[in-house]
């Protein structure tokens, strides 16, 4: 079956060939007039030898002038065959014609001289023809005034109806065509519930009668919500490849332009275009760029972004039931969106795309390795287990980094080692050369082993994956832990053990050297931040009590107010600070005491790390078990 015979494919209707936009017609006309002006100038300034008046008379006396044309201010004429080359030089190219200026004092001997030499004498009106004088005199002013009126009219048109010579008011929405789209729903994995919702909406657009018979009404809008990299835009691209209806896509930032009113004009134009081709889909990416809550204190009702938002609200609320135009939008900041956007009747349905769980990560990896030759030792289940917290975009980047590693090593297949190297590069950072002194290297080893001992023995801590003292990124060494399974709720005991692991490096330095270094700076920062949230946000302190004060939240600009007000007193703030300090000191004391009791394991593990630089989970267990057996012997 040929594409032209397939039903429902409106996007395959032949399109007319390219035409010159009407707004450029005036520019082409102006260019043509300018070229004609240059041609007229050129015709009046043909190549002629310029002679001094005395040279002209000498040429006449020598019989080298064939004819002349007398004018008020100049004399032009032509040479005989012998005279054309007499006056030629480097600055005067040879020419059969000449021109000379007449002196202001009349020469009574000129005409008798010309008659004696039998030179043909012609008379001529002075200056150019009248029509040339008229054109050359008025043409520059005509062009200038025409350009001024053109730009003035264009600006008025932009302000009133969104048009203009440069299409400022035209929508920047791009129409996706099925035959050019390379992404389908088969390329989207790990978000099956979202795919079902989207498939239902596409089916509604293609077969609305099936739903209308049951009294169902199509949603006006669908909002895709989720962290960056979870597949919102990918899902939209897949819809463009699957839908048998016109699909228009645009980024919300493309509505805003340097001219006032352009954003609202582009919104109107986009919806008008979609209505003409209904049923249709409109996809707006990064909706929060124009959909932030109004009245944020940055600009009033004249704010261009607010005008654009108001126009979107009007267009969506103005839909009729029979229009069959659906708005699909994506954002990773639903908290900043205006409440008018989120009410029923505009974005009726919200689809949440979260970071994938283990099975979903494995499904996503299988999609991304379709074109990647894998070695037999690659186990995608293990790769998925090790990539807790990775988004779909992170997993795609992981596969690509593994393929780059294999190509760098001149391998024909991507093996498990390539995935390990890629994982370390993404999580730990690129390996770098750092010239550490033996003392610094030993200090880094004890620091990382302090983390490792606490992670190994704390019952709620995440299992160890590796220890390395090879510098990665900005870190001199890394102790890596991987959760056994995805976590969605964190218990108080788990968080306490996590803080103890963070303080293990600093405590090990204090035990071995009697002082601490700056290497624990980030550990202290993260431990304090976590404990502040436990005390002030999650109510995990008996002294403060079950109060959710929002302390520790990362207050970003929410679009509604410049900063969150503090909902507790100065006295309570002092109590919270005191509680955080006392708990950190207690955790540090416990960690120092625990590592002191396991000093032999700490020394053995540090020696092994300094010798091998990197230890896997199995090697760590082997070293610690051997040290413990020697201690009990």
UniProtKB/Swiss-Prot annotation:
Active site location: 448
Cystine pairings recorded for this chain: none
Residues the entry annotates as binding Zn(2+): 447, 451, 523
Recorded GO MF terms: ATP binding; ATP hydrolysis activity; ATP-dependent peptidase activity; metalloendopeptidase activity; zinc ion binding
Cofactor note text: Binds 1 zinc ion per subunit.
Entry's EC annotation: 3.4.24.-
Residues annotated for ATP binding in this entry: 226-233
Regions of this protein lying in the Periplasmic compartment: 41-133
Membrane topology according to the record: Multi-pass membrane protein
UniProt keywords, alphabetically: ATP-binding, Cell inner membrane, Cell membrane, Hydrolase, Membrane, Metal-binding, Metalloprotease, Nucleotide-binding, Protease, Transmembrane, Transmembrane helix, Zinc
Functional summary from the UniProt entry: Acts as a processive, ATP-dependent zinc metallopeptidase for both cytoplasmic and membrane proteins. Plays a role in the quality control of integral membrane proteins.
Database matches in PANTHER family: ATP-DEPENDENT ZINC METALLOPROTEASE YME1L1 (PTHR23076:SF97), METALLOPROTEASE M41 FTSH (PTHR23076)
Oligomeric and partner information: Homohexamer.
HAMAP family: FtsH
Protein's name in the database: ATP-dependent zinc metalloprotease FtsH
Native source species: Marinobacter nauticus (strain ATCC 700491 / DSM 11845 / VT8) (Marinobacter aquaeolei)
Name of the gene this protein is made from: ftsH
